[in-house]
Swiss-Prot record:
This is ATP-dependent Clp protease proteolytic subunit. Belongs to the peptidase S14 family. Fourteen ClpP subunits assemble into 2 heptameric rings which stack back to back to give a disk-like structure with a central cavity, resembling the structure of eukaryotic proteasomes. Cleaves peptides in various proteins in a process that requires ATP hydrolysis. Has a chymotrypsin-like activity. Plays a major role in the degradation of misfolded proteins. The gene is clpP. Pfam families: CLP_protease. Keywords: Cytoplasm, Hydrolase, Protease, Serine protease. The lineage of its organism: Bacteria, Pseudomonadati, Pseudomonadota, Alphaproteobacteria, Hyphomicrobiales. GO terms for cellular component: cytoplasm; endopeptidase Clp complex. The active site is at 106 (nucleophile), 131. It catalyses: Hydrolysis of proteins to small peptides in the presence of ATP and magnesium. alpha-casein is the usual test substrate. In the absence of ATP, only oligopeptides shorter than five residues are hydrolyzed (such as succinyl-Leu-Tyr-|-NHMec, and Leu-Tyr-Leu-|-Tyr-Trp, in which cleavage of the -Tyr-|-Leu- and -Tyr-|-Trp bonds also occurs). Disulfide bonds: none annotated. The keyword Hydrolase applies.
Length: 210
């Protein structure tokens, strides 16, 4: 059976750009990276996280002051992989704007909320979902207890991050994340995950001149 990732990559369109040295071909995502646009798409896992972190660091090296745009369409995934992206967003110097296209669930919603203040956006038909972390463990009883304590520590840390970026109280975040909480774009704005719901290009943030 053919690797679905290989099939997908073969379908990525190429764009041709005219330069002083002739034509140059890029895959569409590399071309958009030149415009400082990053895509966080699909499940959050170590491979995707590493690529996203690398792109953030590259764009910072290119211009430490110019805005980076992050387009998010993700069901979430591995907490530590998501936190690697989150920490890098906070660590680098350029402001990172976030825009939800499709869905931002679980870790996807945390990354959406982690954008620069007043630069977090959602398209009108996007869906956002927040919840507490989940996991399953097996092994010796003591090890299971240690893993259970670790996931509780992660839950507390994630709650604190949501508090920081949404302006909600810790109790409100804890209650909201107790079960899967689905939000429309407008509800996510009212909750503090995004700053604005946009439906026109003219309202979308554009990179500032260096």
């Amino acid at each position: 059976m053919r690797d679905p990732v290989e099939t997908y990559m073969n379908l990525v369109p190429m764009v041709v750009e005219q330069t002083n040295r002739g034509e140059r071909a890029y895959d569409i995502f590399s071309r958009l990276l030149k415009e400082r646009i990053i895509f966080v798409t699909g499940p959050v896992e170590d491979g995707m996280s590493t690529l996203t972190v690398a792109q953030l660091l590259f764009l910072e090296a290119e211009n430490p002051k110019k805005e980076i745009s992050m387009y998010i369409n993700s069901p979430g995934g591995v907490v530590t992989s998501g936190l690697a992206i989150y920490d890098t967003m906070q660590f680098i110097r350029p402001p990172v704007s976030t825009l939800c296209t499709g869905q931002a669930a679980s870790m996807g919603s945390l990354l959406l909320a982690a954008g620069h203040p007043d630069m977090r956006f959602s398209l009108p038909n996007s869906r956002i979902m927040v919840h507490q972390p989940s996991g399953g463990f097996q092994g010796q009883a003591t090890d299971i207890m240690l893993h259970a304590q670790e996931i509780l520590n992660l839950k507390k840390r994630l709650n604190e991050i949501y508090v920081k970026h949404t302006g909600q109280t810790y109790k409100a975040i804890e209650d909201a994340l107790e079960r899967d909480k689905f939000l429309t774009a407008d509800m996510a704005r009212d909750f503090g995950i995004v700053d604005k719901v946009i439906d026109k290009r003219s309202e979308e943030p554009t990179p500032k001149a260096p």
